[in-house]
């Protein structure tokens, strides 16, 4: 339990330690997933009973088939009653292969073969773990939790295993990086772009370029990723002093510094 609480505290600290220059509003699912995850973790720590504790064999009896006990699925060891979605999860439904088991891996890989319908996510990247918790958040929101699956993620007493703590550590790092990336997109929205064989390419800024709605247009700049040599076109606000300190920003060749559009010559 102590390790579990330490993991929870580490998760909160990781998200709160975003660099000051990236302290912008975070949009998308990241906040929703984080809040849902924290509520679930706190609930698990304080709950006196973990609900049903099912073995793999017991869970297999809830596949919606003949003589089935019900319609359950598990994701990251958490078991949900998906009876209200029988149209999709029951026999003949498009997601029936998820029922009666924990097929966490397939939610991300899309591999619905017998081998792919596994709960082994030990080789997942941080971004894949974040995406998987998006799915967990969906089931927590839309379906009824009924208990835990004994095995990879939960012990016979319903406590999280080291494997689950490892996954949650990856979630912590992944959420932090996603928050930083989304904050950077607010500070450096992507440019609009077009290309033609005849005239080459053009990049330009608008109040909606990069999908970021704002009250300023900006001017195009190349933003390089340190150590990679790769860049993307971003729109910057010249009046914002933070840009003058960023050595990874460069102007486009033969483009006036205050131009909202830059022509890119063909190679």
Swiss-Prot record:
The Cytochrome b5 heme-binding domain, residue ranges: 53-150
Entry's localization field: Secreted
Signal peptide interval: 1-17
Superkingdom: Eukaryota
GO cellular component terms listed in the entry, alphabetical order: endomembrane system; extracellular region; membrane
A single GO BP: nervous system development
Keywords assigned by UniProt, alphabetized: Neurogenesis, Secreted, Signal
A UniProt-annotated Pfam family: Cyt-b5
Entry similarity comment: Belongs to the cytochrome b5 family. MAPR subfamily.
Function according to Swiss-Prot or TrEMBL: Heme-binding protein which promotes neuronal but not astrocyte differentiation.
Entry-linked PANTHER family: MEMBRANE-ASSOCIATED PROGESTERONE RECEPTOR COMPONENT-RELATED, NEUFERRICIN
Comment block on domains: The cytochrome b5 heme-binding domain was proven to bind heme, although it lacks the conserved iron-binding His residues at position 90 and 114.
Name of the protein in its database record: Neuferricin
Species of origin: Danio rerio (Zebrafish)
């Amino acid at each position: 339990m102590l390790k579990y609480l330490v993991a929870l505290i580490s998760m909160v600290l990781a998200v709160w330690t975003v660099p000051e220059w990236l302290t912008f509003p975070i949009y998308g699912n990241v906040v929703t997933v984080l809040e849902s995850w924290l509520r679930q973790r706190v609930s698990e720590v304080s709950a006196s009973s973990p609900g049903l504790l099912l073995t793999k064999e017991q869970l297999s009896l809830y596949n919606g088939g003949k003589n089935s006990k019900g319609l359950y699925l598990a994701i990251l060891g958490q078991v949900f009653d998906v009876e209200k979605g029988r149209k999709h999860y029951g026999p003949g439904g498009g997601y029936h292969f998820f029922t009666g088991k924990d097929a966490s891996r397939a939610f991300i890989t899309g591999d619905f073969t017998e081998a792919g319908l596994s709960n082994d996510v030990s080789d997942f990247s941080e971004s894949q773990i974040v995406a998987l918790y998006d799915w967990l958040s969906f089931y927590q929101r839309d379906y009824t939790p009924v208990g835990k699956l004994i095995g990879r993620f939960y012990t016979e007493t319903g406590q999280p295993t080291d494997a689950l703590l490892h996954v949650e550590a990856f979630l912590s790092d992944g959420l932090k990086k996603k928050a930083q990336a989304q904050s950077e997109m607010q500070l450096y929205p992507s440019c609009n772009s077009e290309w033609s064989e005849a005239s080459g390419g053009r990049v330009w800024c608008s109040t909606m370029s990069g999908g970021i709605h704002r009250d300023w247009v900006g001017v195009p700049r190349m933003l390089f990723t340190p150590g990679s040599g790769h860049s993307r076109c971003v729109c910057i606000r010249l009046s914002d002093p933070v840009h003058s300190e960023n050595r990874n920003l460069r102007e486009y060749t033969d483009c006036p510094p205050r131009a909202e559009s830059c022509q890119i010559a063909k190679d």
